[in-house]
Amino acid sequence: MERIKELRNLMSQSRTREILTKTTVDHMAIIKKYTSGRQEKNPSLRMKWMMAMKYPITADKRITEMIPERNEQGQTLWSKMNDAGSDRVMVSPLAVTWWNRNGPMTSTVHYPKIYKTYFEKVERLKHGTFGPVHFRNQVKIRRRVDINPGHADLSAKEAQDVIMEVVFPNEVGARILTSESQLTITKEKKEELQDCKISPLMVAYMLERELVRKTRFLPVAGGTSSVYIEVLHLTQGTCWEQMYTPGGEVRNDDVDQSLIIAARNIVRRAAVSADPLASLLEMCHSTQIGGTRMVDILRQNPTEEQAVDICKAAMGLRISSSFSFGGFTFKRTSGSSVKREEEVLTGNLQTLKIRVHEGYEEFTMVGKRATAILRKATRRLIQLIVSGRDEQSIAEAIIVAMVFSQEDCMIKAVRGDLNFVNRANQRLNPMHQLLRHFQKDAKVLFQNWGIEHIDNVMGMIGILPDMTPSTEMSMRGVRVSKMGVDEYSSAERVVVSIDRFLRVRDQRGNVLLSPEEVSETQGTEKLTITYSSSMMWEINGPESVLVNTYQWIIRNWETVKIQWSQNPTMLYNKMEFEPFQSLVPKAIRGQYSGFVRTLFQQMRDVLGTFDTTQIIKLLPFAAAPPKQSRMQFSSLTVNVRGSGMRILVRGNSPVFNYNKTTKRLTVLGKDAGTLTEDPDEGTAGVESAVLRGFLILGKEDRRYGPALSINELSNLAKGEKANVLIGQGDVVLVMKRKRDSSILTDSQTATKRIRMAIN
């Protein structure tokens, strides 16, 4: 009451009324704004005002000895007055012009090296092409983007160590350069910067630009790679966009792009192997991208993409806490839920067991071409606000949200059976079954969803089941907005776990990622990806599998032939023969394998027809589980080039051609390597491996009984002699050594002695 009386009193005075009604409200605020604090509030105005003065710049006193008092036009360049509050002189902007024209020249050789990122940017802009300007509403969403083209991917700490080592090599302080990239960069930069006169601080700044990825959270409508972001201010405004093609690419964008392709290929391949996690790790460790180990790139590169994140999780690295479903990144912004198993019936009366999220939750959904805000309760979609580039993208987002809502009308909209499988022919989980079903055809889903009258809300519009916009009606709870939904800004990373089937979970057990979420999009990598793992041979098709398999046998022939004679089963089980099996017609795989294994056994035992070329040629066929049959084959079929091609058991064919003279093997006309030994003397290789520990005494001696096969030799006692049948069907006399020490020399001498004994 007291306050009200006081206010009435004030209002009765005419002056008060005048002040309150006539003065603009922000008058005081403005005065306050420009007079409080040390921070300059209007830098550009301040700059213009200062530059209008005669001597706006201060400089060190020494400048007066280096610059004349007046220039050629007689204009004063510096004032005899000292700058108030410092011992510097006041200088005119004209002095800068004089210095630029007449000042001392230094060597410019280091400038392009130090200011490399700037010089490269100028080149990109010079060769870039700017297209027409289009005026249209821009749906921008804030994304975390790389604003610094042409950088390496060192962490801030790694870069700091490199910079200290390059710029201040003699400073004290512990610097440990461990990674390969650190060492390479340091060496390169030290060489480049010999006798460099540019100030060390400037060099340090520029090096930082070159070494560290800088990201900002910016509104973007188009391309997000760094060569587009550097011209963001030229290519998109609030209501316009300008087409632009960069005049050059930078390695960091190429690395990001190639990393995504490599990771997708590896996850897809690992998912179909017997032990997906082990396979994935093996492939990540044996793959190089542009000459750098993929695992090193994964440790340094912050790219967030489903396949990349699965690889990171497998390596024990932290990843973003958002989860992926239907190709959209979901981030819960409020609410919470508990999960409970529930059985539901589809429209086809098929029972599905789904994990229901009970509770109210809000999510942002961000995809490549559409974004949305989703509010849901237990098995109920409350509201979905979508924005997207086109009708198709908007529809994709709506389907994903409807499936994610787990609403009953969605499950009842299923027509037909759900039996989608992944690449490994395993049934997908129910949520992905539903998703695949409606991604194929969402007509029934949209028709059954229900429609409602809508209020007129600024910037929002309804959408009908046939995806046409409307201002009157809309599918229940669904609206289309002109504004995009920002990507989740936090760069926070969490510890995750990954199971054998590559499902990634956070510490509460929520599934964040799984192989089903990995995009099937194929692209061509910008940098060369070298997959050393045999699992990736099939990425370039059947021919590549064939060539790679034979190349591998030839490269490893020394160890292969020893295993061939001593431990064939272990050899047949080698993973390098796995890809080859997909080329052999399924129906006959087992028979081929049985036939080849029998043939090999005869070679080892009786016939003495050891033939290197034949072993190499037939070995991959022996890897399949064998079927016992009496069938004999003169040729074996492989499916390449879209049809069955024959490999002859004896002799050459277009598929497998060995040239005795050059010792070169060509597979389908492609070079598969050179054999280091002559196949006719190939027996020596296996024999010498097997005859270690035996001394070859000479030709066959009947007194020592019938010839044994190589496999039977192991039964001899030390010092005992026996006849033995070797590769070409010849028999020699051997004695088991009394001492083990000289075994190593046996394999070398065996070859020579076998020849002497035979001849």
Swiss-Prot record:
GO molecular function per UniProt: RNA binding; RNA-directed RNA polymerase activity
Marked site positions, Mammalian adaptation: 627
UniProt xrefs under SUPFAM superfamilies: PB2 C-terminal domain-like
Alphabetically ordered keywords of this record: Cap snatching, Eukaryotic host gene expression shutoff by virus, Eukaryotic host transcription shutoff by virus, Host gene expression shutoff by virus, Host mitochondrion, Host nucleus, Host-virus interaction, Inhibition of host innate immune response by virus, Inhibition of host MAVS by virus, Inhibition of host RLR pathway by virus, Inhibition of host RNA polymerase II by virus, mRNA capping, mRNA processing, Viral immunoevasion, Viral transcription, Virion
Example GO biological process: 7-methylguanosine mRNA capping
Keyword set includes Nucleus: no
A cellular component annotation (GO) from this entry: virion component
Motif annotated as Nuclear localization signal, chain positions: 736-739
Pfam families: Flu_PB2_1st, Flu_PB2_2nd, Flu_PB2_3rd, Flu_PB2_4th, Flu_PB2_5th, Flu_PB2_6th, Flu_PB2_7th
Cellular location(s): Virion; Host nucleus; Host mitochondrion
Self-association and partners: Influenza RNA polymerase is composed of three subunits: PB1, PB2 and PA. Interacts (via N-terminus) with PB1 (via C-terminus). Interacts with nucleoprotein NP (via N-terminus). Interacts (via N-terminus) with host MAVS (via N-terminus); this interaction inhibits host innate immune response.
Protein family (similarity comment): Belongs to the influenza viruses PB2 family.
Function: Plays an essential role in transcription initiation and cap-stealing mechanism, in which cellular capped pre-mRNAs are used to generate primers for viral transcription. Recognizes and binds the 7-methylguanosine-containing cap of the target pre-RNA which is subsequently cleaved after 10-13 nucleotides by the viral protein PA. Plays a role in the initiation of the viral genome replication and modulates the activity of the ribonucleoprotein (RNP) complex.
Protein name: Polymerase basic protein 2
